[in-house]
Amino acid sequence: MANPITSVKVSQTLPPAPNTLQRTGAFISQGATTTAQDTLTLITQLSDLTTILTAPQAVSSITWSSGTATVTTTLPHGYPVGSGTINLTLAGFTPIGYNGTFACTITTTTEFTFALAVDPGAVTVEGTVIAADVARLNYDVTNFFAQGAGNSVYILELGVGTTADGVTTLTAFLTANPGTIYAFLVPPTWDSEAAFLTLIASYESITAKLYFFVTTTTATYSRYTALMKDVMWMVNAPTAPATEPSSIVGMFWQWIYNQPSSSNPLAPMNCRYVYGLTPWTGLGNNTILTEIYAADGNYIGSGAEGGISNAIIRGGFTADSQQANYWYAIDWVQINLDLDISNAVINGSNNQAAPLLYNQAGINTLQSVAVSTMQNAQTYGLSLGNVVTTQLSATAFAASYNAGQFVGQTDVNADPFLSYSTENPTHYKIGQYNGISVIFTPQLGFEQIVINVNATEVV
């Protein structure tokens, strides 16, 4: 229209899309799938795994001599030559003494050897060979989906190799793809791998937001120390079958199933139900279960003490003795404060009616966003205590904190514009504001309850 009386300027304020990192988990595969190395494949149901599992390879001959079996495959097997021992599973042979899972040395592109003390005899029926990790991965993913609906998971293929090869490949993947996966369920064979402990040490910081779910044993769990906030470990029950290589898969499922909200607050990890997994029995095991619990480990127990027949997670700890919810809450607060404040800054630069500027009003806006985030944390079962706001200088805030003023509360402090600019005279020029501080206590659950009972004859 020519010569309009009114012009309308339009800006758009967009809400942040939820950050889904804490719902992202992955199983480690070492040659169990047909996908390329460093490939992440999303699995939404068990049948998705079936289509990518490696098929057995035909063996053309197997011979025995002086305690060593030599296997020749019909086609090149694809296992790395000279990289150390690799666990392979042989099946379908007659005599059956050649069947089983063995630590194999790859000698050529079509041959490998393994130690076999007794000569099974001449082969009359040739069988097949497959990476041992295929069965393990299939069982773990089967048990994962047995926990319930509503969860998907990734498979990260690291390629066939030794446990050390797998750790090296995962280390490189994590360096190249930070913040991609929140939790990994690692193969039980990694429990004895020294390089894995080095990898764990790289993600022990309070900001790491990465967790490893580990299957260990009563003889080796002491490897996992109080520094390892990024590890949750579990010892399988002695009666767990071969189809249950990693009982901790139930805890892994629960960890990435969390999606806290006002209608679904975060529940404690301890005593959550698991399905299809083998619980420890108290008969003859009380001492070791007490030791596992005292060492901040986890195990599958029974709900019988509460009159419930379901198997449950006992412990719910990270290796540094914290309840799992402690670190989940800290991660959630980091992720969502970043998300919500960044969203406010971006929207503020695209709002012509009320742009976000570096002044007291702008600081007030950012503080209100942080307050809203922490109010959600409280409502979602992540933070203990009511949310309060303060606008104190750095010195005054430190004094109040040291005096215990914020005990039992969640405080969101914003250093006022004038005092902050005086304390940090170069920051205004470069647009940097470091004046928002949040103090909160992660919401935890009960672990043990003591009831005092006094029986009296006084009437």
State where each predicted segment sits.
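Small-residue-rich
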Residues: M1-P56, A131-R223
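Small/polar beta-strand repeat architecture
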Residues: P56-G84, A91-V134
